[in-house]
Amino acid sequence: MLILSRKVNEGIVIDDNIHIKVISIDRGSVRLGFEAPESTLILRAELKEAIVSENQKASASVDESLLENIKKVIKP
């Protein structure tokens, strides 16, 4: 992991097209601004983890009887 120190209004550039700027530092909280192409997905880590968790729950809760009914309808 690369660790950098930045002050307010200083920034970091990633891959020439992603710019991160320190907007403010207040009471243990840092506000960051991001400039990136619209195709770049930027998420807070906890939101990404929640999405992954929900996707895993959704894929694990397949009703086996429903699958059997689908197999009966779709015969090779």
UniProtKB/Swiss-Prot annotation:
One of its GO terms (molecular function) is mRNA 5'-UTR binding. InterPro entries: CsrA, CsrA_sf. Its main location: cytoplasm. Pfam families: CsrA. One of its GO terms (biological process) is regulation of bacterial-type flagellum assembly. It comes from the Bacteria. It is found in: Cytoplasm. The keyword RNA-binding applies. PANTHER family: CARBON STORAGE REGULATOR. Homodimer; the beta-strands of each monomer intercalate to form a hydrophobic core, while the alpha-helices form wings that extend away from the core. This is Translational regulator CsrA. It comes from Helicobacter pylori (strain Shi470). The gene is csrA.
